[in-house]
């Protein structure tokens, strides 16, 4: 495979980052932590939320979405409604109970049936143990319990039943996990798809103003939060509530209200203490996470700038700075461990006090002849069974609180509305009816920021099947014109029409399906060459993909690769040279076969030889199509039917190459400047 040199890689990557606003540092930082995250799916009980697996869609949003060159855009006011925790839980419940999917509803019912079955058998374990002990320790047991004797016959049978109850409870728990996992994973899948679809529905203005790192964190944390909350609800909160209720009722029925009161008071104290301590520990944990992030960021930044560190012999300096930040993490982590020890001691003290009180009452009952040794064992067993779910209460509470916060951010994001292509409005519009593909701008005004006008009342027309080149200095509004046609932005005033139809009054999908784009920086998917070409028309056959590659003059090059069309192009296509990537973009355009072609300085970053080859292919692609070329090199512009010269958002000259040279105006000056550079 033809590989670009290290210098070409750096230049290509730098060009992409400068034009698209791609944050290389954040990307590496994010990727680093992706590697060290543990993969996990719905577990029981849940661990800390930070260790659960992220949504499959998060890598997809790790780069800022851009089109052509970057321009500063006006802040987009967020149109969001306040999302309460109750509404979030209600929304999750709606995904859990999908009325249109009876199989999933049956799984939900089955999971709750397994939950009840597990807890019912769980409370039988201490009871059966009590029966066995009383039977073995009291000679009067057989006479006073004829029904139990008839049911079990021997103490060994009771102990076998004890084992069956324990195993059955465990089996129901595992069956509940197995049955409910399908529901939980489908819920996560449904919401993840909705998030990705929402990302693509939002307009470019939103993406230009949204911090990529913040957006990525919202999606990542929100998807993990779904897993956390579902785990907490199904595997911790609901089972614990059910078990506390059952234990309290059994104790009240068998031994009196005082035992139920002890249970309720101890559980209430335990929960209150745990929640108060957890609130304090959340603050400590937050400080620890921040310190850890600072240290990790410093280490990664140092490694990213490895060569710079070596140039100035600053290895010791970097190590000291990292050590200072890691010391902050060490202090915070130590504080966290101390608070955790205090939490454990407090929980143990409350539980031990309640258990001791109950045991003292039981011993008095035994001394008075009102209770048996088996009763003491039963009370002890019932109370101990509450200790495990209560032990995880702090983790569950902190994860649930954080999960609700993260989900609020994600659901607010889902409530964002797009200024362009709102589906409710768009589906009511008629499709674009092509009659040749003529394009007209009628007194168009546009600005990204109120104080900076980009297009200032421009008007021009591109006849169907003709080609127009737009030239001018940087910032004159050339690429913005292409954005207007593709309707990434709407005009502030004026009209953009295709075949006499205002593009705001036609269905967005039909508009964009009629337009092909060849950008300056072709960013490819990290997939095969075949996939990247096929992406231009997903309904195309293999032979049509090969024909498109031949027309783009890249088929022979691909066939020389060891894996041919199955060759992976690498992240953003960096395994291919600039010319090869442009040919892939051209092959996509051939495959799409649009009526209108937009090219944004498609050859400006290429050498002269590659430019000539690409231009030859472009002329073939542009044949009998309405084409607009944003041209940096005027050798591209001179071959078009008409040239528009732009300055400060206005068309200052227009005509053919020869006519504009004859005017000795702005175009002639640009031509002279470029030729002078070539001569030098």
Curated annotation (Swiss-Prot):
Tissue-by-tissue expression: Mostly expressed at low levels in roots and flowers.
Complexes and interactors: Homodimer.
Organism name: Arabidopsis thaliana
Every ABC transmembrane type-1 domain range: 108-402
Stated role: Performs an essential function in the generation of cytoplasmic iron-sulfur proteins by mediating export of Fe/S cluster precursors synthesized by NFS1 and other mitochondrial proteins. Not involved in the export of cyclic pyranopterin monophosphate (cPMP) from mitochondria to the cytosol.
Membrane-crossing residue ranges in chain numbering: 109-129, 145-165, 232-252, 255-275, 340-360, 376-396
GO terms under cellular component: mitochondrial inner membrane; mitochondrion
Family assignment from sequence similarity: Belongs to the ABC transporter superfamily. ABCB family. Heavy Metal importer (TC 3.A.1.210) subfamily.
Biological classification of the source: Eukaryota, Viridiplantae, Streptophyta, Embryophyta, Tracheophyta
Sequence ranges assigned to domain ABC transporter in this UniProt record: 439-673
Transit peptide as recorded in UniProt: 1-75
Protein name: ABC transporter B family member 24, mitochondrial
SUPFAM superfamilies: ABC transporter transmembrane region (SSF90123), P-loop containing nucleoside triphosphate hydrolases (SSF52540)
Binding site for ATP: 448, 472-483
Main localization (coarse): mitochondrion
């Amino acid at each position: 495979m033809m590989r670009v040199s290290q210098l070409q890689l750096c230049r290509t990557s730098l060009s992409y980052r400068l034009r698209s606003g791609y944050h290389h540092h954040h990307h590496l930082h994010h990727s680093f932590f992706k590697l060290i995250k543990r993969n996990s799916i719905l577990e029981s009980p849940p661990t800390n939320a930070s260790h659960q697996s992220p949504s499959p869609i998060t890598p997809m949003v790790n780069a800022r979405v851009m089109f052509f060159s970057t321009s500063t855009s006006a802040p987009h006011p967020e149109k969001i409604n306040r999302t309460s925790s109750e509404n979030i839980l209600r929304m999750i419940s709606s995904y859990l109970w999908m009325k249109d999917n009876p199989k999933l509803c049956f799984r939900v019912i089955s999971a709750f049936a397994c939950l009840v079955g597990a807890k019912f058998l769980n409370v039988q374990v201490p009871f059966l143990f009590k029966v066995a002990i009383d039977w073995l320790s009291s000679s009067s047991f057989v006479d006073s319990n004829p029904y139990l004797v008839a049911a079990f016959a021997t103490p060994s049978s009771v102990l076998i039943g004890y084992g069956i109850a324990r195993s059955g409870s465990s089996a129901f728990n595992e069956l509940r996990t197995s049955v409910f996992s399908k529901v939980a994973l489908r819920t996560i899948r449904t919401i993840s798809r909705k998030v990705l679809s929402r990302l693509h529905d939002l307009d470019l203005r939103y993406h230009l103003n949204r911090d990529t790192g913040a957006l990525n964190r919202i999606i990542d944390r929100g998807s993990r939060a779904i897993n956390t909350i579902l785990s907490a609800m199904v595997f911790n909160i609901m089972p614990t509530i059910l078990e506390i209720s059952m234990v309290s009722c059994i104790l009240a029925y068998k031994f009196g209200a005082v035992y139920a009161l002890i249970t309720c008071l101890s559980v209430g104290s335990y929960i209150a203490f745990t929640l108060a301590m957890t609130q304090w520990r959340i603050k400590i944990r937050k400080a620890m996470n921040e310190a850890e992030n600072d240290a990790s960021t410093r280490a990664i930044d140092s490694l990213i700038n490895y060569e710079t560190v070596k140039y100035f012999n600053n290895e010791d300096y970097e190590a000291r700075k990292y050590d200072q930040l890691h010391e902050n993490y060490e202090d915070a982590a130590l504080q966290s461990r101390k608070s955790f020890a205090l939490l454990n001691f407090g929980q143990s003290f409350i539980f031990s006090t309640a258990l001791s009180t109950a045991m003292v009452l039981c011993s008095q009952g035994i001394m008075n002849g009102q209770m048996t040794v088996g009763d003491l064992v039963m009370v002890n067993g019932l109370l101990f069974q509450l200790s495990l779910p209560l032990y995880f209460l702090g983790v569950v509470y902190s994860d649930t609180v954080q999960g609700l916060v993260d989900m609020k951010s994600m659901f607010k994001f889902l409530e964002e509305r797009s200024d362009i292509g709102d589906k409710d409005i768009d589906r009511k519009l008629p499709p674009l009816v092509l009659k040749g593909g003529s394009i007209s701008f009628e007194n168009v005004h546009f600005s990204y920021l109120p104080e900076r006008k980009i297009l200032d009342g421009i008007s021009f027309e591109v006849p169907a099947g003709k080609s127009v080149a737009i030239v001018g200095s940087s910032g004159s509004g050339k690429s913005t014109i292409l954005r207007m046609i593709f309707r990434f932005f709407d005009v502030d005033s004026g009209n953009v029409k295709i075949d006499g139809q205002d593009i705001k009054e036609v269905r967005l999908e039909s508009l964009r399906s009629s337009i092909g784009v060849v950008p300056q920086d072709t960013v490819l998917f990290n997939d095969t060459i075949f996939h990247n070409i096929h992406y231009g028309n997903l309904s195309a056959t293999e032979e049509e993909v090969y024909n498109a590659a031949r027309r783009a003059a890249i088929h022979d090059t691909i066939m020389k690769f060891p894996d041919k069309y199955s060759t992976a192009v690498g992240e953003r296509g960096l395994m291919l040279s600039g010319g090869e990537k442009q040919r892939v973009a051209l092959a996509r355009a051939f495959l799409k076969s649009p009526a209108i072609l937009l090219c944004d300085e498609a050859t400006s970053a290429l050498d002269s030889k590659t430019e000539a080859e690409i231009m030859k292919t472009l002329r073939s692609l542009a044949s009998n199509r309405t084409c607009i070329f944003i041209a940096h090199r005027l050798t591209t512009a001179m071959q078009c039917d008409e040239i528009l010269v732009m300055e400060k958002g206005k068309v200052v000259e227009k005509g053919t190459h020869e006519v504009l040279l004859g005017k000795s105006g702005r175009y002639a000056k640009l031509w002279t400047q470029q030729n002078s550079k070539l001569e030098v």
